[in-house]
Amino acid sequence: MQSRNLWRILGLCLLSVGAWGQDEDFKASDDLTSISPEKRFKVSISGTEVVVTCPDVFGYDNIKWEKNDNLVEGASNRELSQKEFSEVDDSGYYACYADSIKEKSYLYLRARVCANCIEVNLMAVVTIIVADICLTLGLLLMVYYWSKTRKANAKPVMRGTGAGSRPRGQNKEKPPPVPNPDYEPIRKGQQDLYSGLNQRGI
């Protein structure tokens, strides 16, 4: 009974922690939604390639990029593409601005990339796990019912009462062994050579 109450208390604690974490997430998301969509950066990751798109405020004319306050050479589009992104070398503060507007928009970028990663959404993972559990349970039920029907159809094996076997009821009491004629017992009344033990004086 105490373990049941312990599980209830643990469940309530987990629910309260989850609700508290959701409040923090809502506060953070409120801060993000206060930024207008045209002032947000867009980041897309595919394999080892990372593409950062400058906000729509600056338009499309001659956009320059800076990384950690250093000008990025050869980047004049709204999209900054890095084919072989490295978390150690390429992470940092990125800024984009147009020549006509000197105001800069900053983004701190730190991304983990891998060459052989596959992006999987949550519904696909849940579907795979549920299908695997259902398939395993189905196989277990099939094996259980198959073994149950096989055991019910099997006939009990009876030992035949042949020359070398006895019925099970006679195994409880064994008859005394028959004396062997090669080894007769010593008779006290006879005086034969081997009828007694000779004791020699030393």
Swiss-Prot record:
<dbReference type="InterPro" id="IPR013783">
    <property type="entry name" value="Ig-like_fold"/>
</dbReference>
<dbReference type="Pfam" id="PF02189">
    <property type="entry name" value="ITAM"/>
</dbReference>
<keyword id="KW-0472">Membrane</keyword>
<feature type="compositionally biased region" description="Polar residues">
    <location>
        <begin position="192"/>
        <end position="202"/>
    </location>
</feature>
<dbReference type="GO" id="GO:0042105">
    <property type="term" value="C:alpha-beta T cell receptor complex"/>
</dbReference>
<dbReference type="GO" id="GO:0045059">
    <property type="term" value="P:positive thymic T cell selection"/>
</dbReference>
<keyword id="KW-0393">Immunoglobulin domain</keyword>
<feature type="modified residue" description="Phosphotyrosine">
    <location>
        <position position="194"/>
    </location>
</feature>
<feature type="disulfide bond">
    <location>
        <begin position="54"/>
        <end position="96"/>
    </location>
</feature>
<dbReference type="InterPro" id="IPR003110">
    <property type="entry name" value="Phos_immunorcpt_sig_ITAM"/>
</dbReference>
<dbReference type="GO" id="GO:0002250">
    <property type="term" value="P:adaptive immune response"/>
</dbReference>
<keyword id="KW-0675">Receptor</keyword>
<feature type="region of interest" description="Proline-rich sequence">
    <location>
        <begin position="174"/>
        <end position="181"/>
    </location>
</feature>
<feature type="domain" description="ITAM">
    <location>
        <begin position="173"/>
        <end position="200"/>
    </location>
</feature>
<feature type="topological domain" description="Cytoplasmic">
    <location>
        <begin position="144"/>
        <end position="202"/>
    </location>
</feature>
<feature type="modified residue" description="Phosphotyrosine">
    <location>
        <position position="183"/>
    </location>
</feature>
<dbReference type="GO" id="GO:0009897">
    <property type="term" value="C:external side of plasma membrane"/>
</dbReference>
<feature type="region of interest" description="Disordered">
    <location>
        <begin position="156"/>
        <end position="202"/>
    </location>
</feature>
<keyword id="KW-0732">Signal</keyword>
<keyword id="KW-1015">Disulfide bond</keyword>
<dbReference type="Pfam" id="PF16681">
    <property type="entry name" value="Ig_5"/>
</dbReference>
<feature type="topological domain" description="Extracellular">
    <location>
        <begin position="22"/>
        <end position="122"/>
    </location>
</feature>
<keyword id="KW-1064">Adaptive immunity</keyword>
<keyword id="KW-1003">Cell membrane</keyword>
<keyword id="KW-0812">Transmembrane</keyword>
<dbReference type="InterPro" id="IPR015484">
    <property type="entry name" value="CD3_esu/gsu/dsu"/>
</dbReference>
<keyword id="KW-1133">Transmembrane helix</keyword>
<feature type="signal peptide">
    <location>
        <begin position="1"/>
        <end position="21"/>
    </location>
</feature>
<feature type="transmembrane region" description="Helical">
    <location>
        <begin position="123"/>
        <end position="143"/>
    </location>
</feature>
<keyword id="KW-0597">Phosphoprotein</keyword>
<dbReference type="InterPro" id="IPR003598">
    <property type="entry name" value="Ig_sub2"/>
</dbReference>
<comment type="subunit">
    <text>The TCR-CD3 complex is composed of a CD3D/CD3E and a CD3G/CD3E heterodimers that preferentially associate with TCRalpha and TCRbeta, respectively, to form TCRalpha/CD3E/CD3G and TCRbeta/CD3G/CD3E trimers. In turn, the hexamer interacts with CD3Z homodimer to form the TCR-CD3 complex. Alternatively, TCRalpha and TCRbeta can be replaced by TCRgamma and TCRdelta. Interacts with CD6. Interacts (via Proline-rich sequence) with NCK1; the interaction is ligand dependent but independent of tyrosine kinase activation.</text>
</comment>
<feature type="domain" description="Ig-like">
    <location>
        <begin position="37"/>
        <end position="107"/>
    </location>
</feature>
<feature type="region of interest" description="NUMB-binding region">
    <location>
        <begin position="170"/>
        <end position="187"/>
    </location>
</feature>
<dbReference type="GO" id="GO:0004888">
    <property type="term" value="F:transmembrane signaling receptor activity"/>
</dbReference>
<keyword id="KW-0391">Immunity</keyword>
<dbReference type="InterPro" id="IPR007110">
    <property type="entry name" value="Ig-like_dom"/>
</dbReference>
<comment type="function">
    <text>Part of the TCR-CD3 complex present on T-lymphocyte cell surface that plays an essential role in adaptive immune response. When antigen presenting cells (APCs) activate T-cell receptor (TCR), TCR-mediated signals are transmitted across the cell membrane by the CD3 chains CD3D, CD3E, CD3G and CD3Z. All CD3 chains contain immunoreceptor tyrosine-based activation motifs (ITAMs) in their cytoplasmic domain. Upon TCR engagement, these motifs become phosphorylated by Src family protein tyrosine kinases LCK and FYN, resulting in the activation of downstream signaling pathways.</text>
</comment>
<protein>
    <recommendedName>
        <fullName>T-cell surface glycoprotein CD3 epsilon chain</fullName>
    </recommendedName>
</protein>
<dbReference type="GO" id="GO:0007166">
    <property type="term" value="P:cell surface receptor signaling pathway"/>
</dbReference>
